[in-house]
Regions:
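Positively charged n-region of N-terminal signal peptides that target proteins for export
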Residues: 1-4
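Bacterial N-terminal signal peptides
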Residues: 7-20
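Secreted/extracellular ectodomain signature
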Residues: 22-145
């Protein structure tokens, strides 16, 4: 029985060591976060940008993969004449990606009679909600402030 005890201990401790290794790898990998903005309310826009800024400051630019997805009325955050355009540019310089829903752009083009002029940092995506679903499937955490 005594000669089996070391083998038994090794077998029982192996899963714990493997779990600890997985946890260590997860701690070292960049956080992946997607922020949803689908509301035209200026306070919501400010809140989303504040959250993005806080995440970049907390984790550091190289330690967080952060994407703001704007669709529906929230697309106005990425209009070129939006009051927050300098904040968008500053966050984009910290590797925050800003995705602009092209379905919304098309609908707004019809409603406005012309295509909205978007911030130069806006990256077009076919459908904002699909982008969010795809990112969450890749392990991103969805935050909707």
């Amino acid at each position: 029985m005594r000669r089996f005890l070391p083998v038994l201990c090794a077998l029982l401790s192996a899963p714990l060591l493997q779990f600890a290794s997985i946890q260590a790898l997860a701690a070292d990998s960049p956080k992946q976060i997607v922020l949803q903005i689908s509301d035209s309310d200026p306070e919501k826009q400010t809140l989303v940008l504040n959250v993005a800024n806080n995440l970049v400051k907390a984790y550091g630019p190289g330690n967080v993969k952060l994407e703001v997805v704007a669709f529906g009325p929230g697309l106005v955050l990425l209009f070129n004449d939006n009051a927050n355009k300098d904040r968008v540019q500053s966050l984009a310089a910290s590797d925050v990606r800003f995705s602009a829903c092209q379905n919304t752009v098309k609908a707004m083009t019809v409603a406005l009679g012309h295509a909205p002029k978007l911030n130069k940092n806006a990256v077009p995506v076919d459908a904002g909600i699909v982008r969010i679903v795809d990112l969450t499937a890749q392990g991103y955490t969805l935050v909707r402030p």
